[in-house]
Amino acid sequence: YNLTGAIQKYGVQKQKGWHAINLFFNTSAGGQNTVLSDESFARPGDYVIMKALKNLTCGTSACPSDIDPCNSWNPTDIFVRTYDKNKEFTKSFAFRMKTDAEPKLTKNTGFYERTSKLTRNFVDARGYWLPNDYTKHGVINEYTACREKAVVIDLSALRKFEILGPDAEELMNYTLTRNVKKLSIGQVVYSSMCYDNGFMFDDGTLLKMSDHGFRWICGDEYAGEWLKEQAKKKNYKVRIKNSSDQISNISLQGPNSRKILEKFIWTPPTQPKISELQWFRFTICRIKELSGIPLLVSRTGYTGELGYEIWCHPSDAPKVWDVVMDAGKDEGLIPAGFGALDLLRIEAGLILFGNEFDGQVDPFEAGVGFTVPLKTKNEDFIGKDILIKRKENPQKKMVGLELAGKEKANHGDCVHIGRSQVGIITSGCISPTLNKNIALCRIDVGHSELDTEVEVGKIDGHQKRI
C-alpha cells in the first residue's frame, strides 16, 4: 500500500501486491513447506547490482524487523544508488573465506580472455569464473570428446600454496594423511586433509618441488590459513605462500592428450620427457624451445582418462591456450566445462567437496580410505588416533548405484530399504558411456554388499521413490 501510493504519481498503475526479491535475507523452505529464517549472510557494506530493463522508479518502505535473526536482531538502513547506463560493472559474487573476512569479488582466470570468446555460460567456482560448457559444443559433446579424443578444461580456481623451509616436509607429513616422507622430488601424491576429529575438510595433490619445498593444490582457500595455524602450534620453521593468483592451470585430458603435448613441449636433459612421465609425476619444461614459455606439466587429472595438467603464469595463459589448441586441432581437441567434468568424475567414482565430503565425514566414508595408510605411516598426523578407531568401527561406506528408472538421482536424495533410510545420494548422472542411470551413495555398511536392492526417495522420501 505504501509503495503504491508513493509511485502512482509517476504513472505506475495501482496493484494489489508487488513481486519481491529477497536480496539480503537468509530464508528457506522447511520440510512442511514452512518458511524458515536465520542470520543473514550479508554484512554492512554489502551490495547488489541490478540493471533496469525499462524506466526505473524507486520507492522505499520500512521493514525494521528486530524480532528475528534476518537483520542480525539489529535493523540497519538500506541505501539505493543509481548509475548512468554506460557505467560498467564486473559481474561478481562476494566470497568470504571466513565469516569475519573481507569479501572478495569473483575473478577472471588467466584463460578468460580466450574462454569468454567461446561461451557466456560461466559458473562461480569458489571465487573464479569458469566455463560450465561451450556454445559450439555442449556438455555431451564435450564429455564424448574427453572419452574418445581430448579436451582442455580451465581449472585455475584450484588453490595453490607454496610450503617452503627446513620443516616443510614435517609440516605436510603432520597435516596430511599420506606419508609425505616417501615422496621423491618430481613426485605427486593425492591426500586427504582432516580435522582433529578425523573428518575430512579438503583434499588435493602435493607436489615435491625440492628437498625443502612443496606445492599443495586443493579446493579450499582456508587450507592455507589452517596450515599456518598448525605450523605456529608446532613451531615449525616454514613459510606458507598463497600462489593461487600467480599460477593458472588447464587440464588436458583424453586418449590423445599425450600426443598433443609431445608436439610442443621441450624438456631439458635433467627432466623427464612427456613420453617418460609416469602417473603422479611432473616435469619442468617449456613451450617448443629453451627460450619458450616456462611450464610445469603433471600427469594428473579428474576424469578417469589419460591426462595431464599444465601450469603457467597468468600472463602467459592466453598464449599457452593458443599453443595447446593449435597442437590439438588435428587430434579432435575441444574445450570442455564443468558440466562435462562432473559427468566424467562421477563415472570414474572421483569425489567432490560438498558432495562426497563436507567436513562431516572421514576419508573412509568419503571413499578415499586409501589416503590413510595407517599400517605404513608410523608418524603422528592430525586426526590419526580418531581415524584408527573409525576404521575399526566403520558406520558408512561409499558405493555406486545403478538405478532402474530414467529419473536422475540428485545430491541429498535419501536412500531407503522399506521405510528405513539407510543412505544418501552424494552425486548422480545419466552415464553416456554406460547408457545407465548411476549414482554415488554413502550407505550403512550393513547394506553395502554388491547387488543389495535399495530405493531412492524424492520429496520426503516416502511420497515418491525412484
Which residues does each predicted region cover?
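Extracellular structured ligand-interaction cores
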Residues: 45, 73-76, 158, 213, ...
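A short catalytic or substrate-binding loop motif that flags glycine-/basic-rich loops and adjacent residues
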Residues: 16, 69-72, 196-198, 302, ...
